[in-house]
């Protein structure tokens, strides 16, 4: 432990209880190296490190980035500092003008930026799969209200409704990303530092669009994590509804046929082709929502400034990101392989409103036409298929492509700078 000495140490039980799971710490290792590279570059610029010390620190950090993939010891921050110090005495200067707190904050922001960009591209892939299905496999099916056949619809109109929903999710993710895209490094323990540091420089080096101005607000950890989880909860809300629809439309209504690759069998019933993926997606949506709610409750009653309670948000954040990523990765090829069935029936009653409208075009008042159709039970049908329709999203595709390019370029610059 970096803080331990002969006068103050903690029991093994205390240390074990307060340490983060290693799997979580491993995820933050590359981001911690990048933030250290930016920090020591700034310290050198401000005169706290000489040229030789900066070179030694840069060499040690870049080697660690490429060689280490598993954290040992207390946490990722201690691991990086100790490994660098084993290589060079300058490692003892690396923590100057910085707290463990703002190390955590800035690493988490980079993790969230990277995750948001990655998930946005997966959402786009899912939307593309649905759009392709909507345009290429569009047939007349009934539309439902109150879980009853109600009016004419189409597979294309249905699938493109989820494209529309995912575009809104991408807009929400972009708004969240712009809030997350602020540099908290320099907040130190919650109140800044008396040393002359350059927060604008670290903001530029780490590719943030702005710095987080108030150090206390930087330390009120959890709000940005909550905002990202809220957005992911919206994505999974759409996933949940989609899964329910496909289960119903492939089992009860027989509109769709799922490929064998995306179903499972029964240990006792040979005929079964179970939609386990879709059922698990419904459940995993609840897990993401529960993680969001847990973060809300963890941070909800904390006073301002840093509190260790907020450490517990990390696991919910990582698990939420991983769950959404895995779900999108399996649903996209499921949609790509989904076929239309030719073994379903359409109740002629779905044309009731259309029949009433036809009578209106012939001069009958709508209410009279309504009652005429209701009492006669006779319907005029048609075979027109509703076209897919959704809002455009080329600007969102371009935005996320630009952000991926910028994030990767930031990493490359820090790792290869002279």
Q: What residue spans do the PLM features occupy?
A:
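Glycine-rich cofactor/substrate-binding loops
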Residues: 1-35, 90, 269-418
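Charged, flexible cofactor/metal-binding loops and thiol motifs
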Residues: 109-124, 135, 141-142, 148-301, ...
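A helix-coil-helix interface module used to build multimeric assemblies
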Residues: 1-192, 197-203, 265, 278-280, ...
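A structural signal for small-residue-enriched, beta-sheet-centric alpha/beta enzyme cores
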Residues: 100, 212-216, 348, 356
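Short amphipathic alpha-helical segments at helix boundaries and their inter-helical linkers
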Residues: 62-75, 224-228, 376-392
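Generic alpha-helical secondary-structure signal
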Residues: 56-57, 205, 358, 372
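Charged/polar positions within long, soluble alpha-helices
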Residues: 41, 45, 66, 85, ...
